[in-house]
Design a protein with these regions (language model features):
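A short alpha-helical cap/connector motif
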Residues: 1-149, 156-171, 175, 181-233
Length: 233
């Protein structure tokens, strides 16, 4: 009984903090009005298309990672998600002015929606490039050791293959972010043996091998559906 009370209280506190952060972001002088307009458009588009989009908390984390991972060797960041309008605006807010965001998504309509969001956000077309293709088909075309941030919202069945292709693309200090990789905590349920859960567990084990074999720093965060961050040192 006491455990349930504590868990409920913790959930309420987290919800309050998340609401406060979202409210602060909505009136932050450092958060340009144009970006807020672009985000509003992108969120509406994501909702209408039934897409998952990161919370305000995760969005500010992405902006911080984009800013903190900047280096002279970086070409920018990579965004692999149907909700590229939301994710991309947060990342662009943190990227250096001359850095480029590469968006990969097979559906042209979703790419066009992201382009409109970036335009409303005040970013020139030169700040983003769009590859209309399956991510695993084109990751090999990207330059190695060139990206400070790679964000991936992909099927659990593709997590390991994506990590294998994304890891060489990161610069030193760069981070790979897997959205919803912990499947809302179902990885901890030993009775779950469906394909998605097993694939997500395999990917979770794989990122630990990156830590063991390559010195990666792996961080798991209970945000949204569960984030996994893999940083190259």
């Amino acid at each position: 009984m006491m455990k349930c009370v504590i868990e409920t209280a913790s959930a309420q506190v987290f919800a309050q903090m998340s609401a406060y952060i979202a409210e602060r972001n909505s009136r932050d002088a450092l958060f340009p009005e144009a970006v807020r307009e672009g985000l509003s458009h992108a969120h509406v588009e994501a909702e209408e298309n039934g897409l998952r989009a990161p919370s305000a908390v995760v969005g500010t984390l992405l902006a911080t990672l984009a800013a903190g991972g900047a280096s002279g060797h970086s070409q920018g960041a990579v965004c692999v998600t149907p909700a590229a309008g939301v994710v991309g605006l947060h990342i662009l807010r943190g990227l250096p002015e001359k850095a480029t965001l590469t968006c990969i998504e097979p559906e042209a309509a979703l790419q066009n929606s992201a382009k409109q969001a970036f335009k409303l956000g005040g970013y020139s077309p030169s700040r983003a490039r769009f590859l209309t293709a399956r991510p695993l088909d084109v990751m090999g075309r990207l330059a190695a050791d060139s990206y400070q941030l790679i964000y991936a919202d992909v099927s659990p069945l593709e997590l390991t293959a994506f990590a294998e292709r994304a890891w060489p693309l990161l610069t030193a200090g760069g981070t790979l972010v897997f959205a919803d990789s912990l499947l809302d905590g179902t990885l901890a349920d030993a009775t779950r043996r469906d394909r998605d859960t097993e694939a997500a567990r395999a990917a979770d084990d794989y990122v630990d091998t990156l830590a063991a074999d390559h010195g990666a720093v792996v961080t798991r965060l209970p945000l949204d559906g569960g984030l996994t961050l893999v940083t190259k040192r």
